[in-house]
Design a protein with these regions (language model features):
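Conserved NAD+-utilizing ADP-ribose enzyme module
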Residues: 1-78
């Protein structure tokens, strides 16, 4: 599973949902799907795919300012 993050700070693309905090991280099933989404939005300079390993999830939680246990995920398209 992959997330898309900003190259500048590593913050993931999230879906805003009323009453849900932190916002769910949007996920793609594989790297090629994430890269295709980035390319479709002409976002190659700003974004990169990130494989959701345990270490990557710890870093995402730190970037988002929340415990890893409170993170939720929303598959694309959702």
């Amino acid at each position: 599973m992959y997330a898309i993050v900003y190259k500048s700070d590593g913050f993931p693309v999230c879906r805003q949902m009323p009453g849900v905090s932190p916002d769910p991280v949007v996920t793609w099933m594989n790297e090629s799907a994430a890269k295709a989404f980035i390319a479709s939005k002409a976002g190659d300079a700003e974004f990169q795919p990130l494989e959701l390993t345990d270490d990557a999830m710890d870093k995402l939680a730190k970037t988002m300012g929340c415990p890893v246990q409170s993170m939720t995920f929303e598959p694309y398209p959702g």
